Amino acid sequence: MIYINFYELYNIKNIRPLIPSFHVCLLIMFLILYSQEILSFFFMCSKFSMNSLKFCVLFSFKTVYSLLKLIKTLIRKLLYCFHYALDLFADEYKVTANDKHYDYRLKSHRIKDKITTKCKGTTKYFNSRHFEIKNAVENLPSFSSNLTTIGNNLRIFWKNGKIRCIKLTCTPDAEIVNFTSNPNRYRFYETNMQELIRKTICEKSDKAIEKTFLCAQLFKTFCEDGVLQTFQPGFIQLDIASNLQEIKKGTKEYSLKSLEMTTTKESNETLCSNDSKHRIARLKNEDNTQKPISKKRKSKKASHKYLSSRTAPNVDFGNFAKERHRENDVSELYSKTKRTSKIRELYKEIGYDKNEFIHELRENEGPSVLYDSGLDQNGTNYDDAFAAPEAISIEKYVSINEEDPKSPKKETSYQVQEKLSQFFQEEMIHLLEMGEACTSRESQKTRKKNLKENIRKQRTTSTAIRDIAIKFLDDAKCETEDSTNLTNREGEAEKTLNTQPWKNLIENFISELQAEEEENNITEWSDIISVRNDEENQIYELPTCQLETNLLV
């Protein structure tokens, strides 16, 4: 006998209708009985039975069974051809699960529900749309490869343990991740999960990387019970804003590229702001009997291009001086090792060797710059006297680096200049703190009193800023020089004011003075500070400002 397995020739698996096939059979029988008479129906049945017997003589029973199975499959395919395209016109789906038997019900309105998941002993909620499970296929196999969102687009579709089409839609802040599947629009990729990840993701990982997470760990966290346990092809939306970081920490295998994607601005803030903030917070909590902190100085020009995001702390430096004078340990307040290591890293990023760098500084600026930059006269050791923002003379040095065609990192000079500028701005806070710590209380009061008198007498912002610069230089170096060296210090202060970092600090200082509107008897004046740059010959004009008597207290 001839055996032909029609069902295996045209194998359409896992096609489930929206209504049972038994109801379809009853409907067909009703139509036949309604249109034909009973006798004709019996005659038709007898004729059909005779033909069936003749057919069974020629072919085996298995052949007839396979043919009937094929007819049944074709009927399902024709009647419910829109089953795969169900997500094109339906708003939502509702899924009920019972031992891998699923009931599909089409809804005309959106259904939203809250699903509870357990994450590291705590119960967390996330909004999830109901999604369609096409059939009871195998569970999603676990794997340890990292899924990376490339260009915010990555879709995943799997069937019987194999990925067909993969695409994921992720918001820039990674608050919502959408897993969608649509086999009617996208071409299938008949391959296993590991190969697809290696081909489509790992080879393109050098492009725009937004978020990286371990897919298997993500599924284990959010798919612990219920229908989500057997994750099937379909649509799901997860809110992972509060769980993504915990998933990263709890996973041993994850891409380190996500940790390296910190921008230059974030690294600068980490470089400059941590030490001073922790130090100020520690000193504020040491003594509960400390005097109340002075009022905060809020600048009206918050959008000024020279204003840094980290301004000087609004604290009473006199009280801090008492605490530091009691400790008698300036090195504990400001770590020399950390700061010098940062300077070494900045030297390396420019692209020059340290010996060449020292040689250029010695020729262009003289030995004083070497001392201010933390180097001794021989240029071999790093010192703790980081006195002024002009120490490394970064503007002149970067210009030399850009003109040199042999420079290995010519394109990074501007980034290094910005990084050093922000680093110097944060050093201003350290100079204030160290200056108050090194000098005695009597000299502090005398210096501040003389400074106030000079401000009242001269009433020029240029002289006031110059005196402030001298105070910063003297206090940072912890020097007790005679009045005969005042001229040299003024010249050094003028040289300091000509550098770009100090220009930024001066304008920041003036903008803070403009925001002060206290009741004082100091008269108001208008003056222009002409800070001339020898190379560009530019004049920076500063607007009207108002000072008060307790400004530097």
UniProtKB/Swiss-Prot annotation:
Keywords on record: Meiosis
Gene Ontology BP annotations: meiotic cell cycle
Region (Disordered): 267-305
Gene transcribed to yield this protein: meu18
Listed Basic and acidic residues bias regions: 275-289
Keyword Calcium appears in the UniProt entry: no
This protein's GO CC annotations: cytoplasm; nuclear envelope
Entry protein name: Meiotic expression up-regulated protein 18
Keyword DNA-binding assigned: no
Biased composition (Basic residues): 293-304
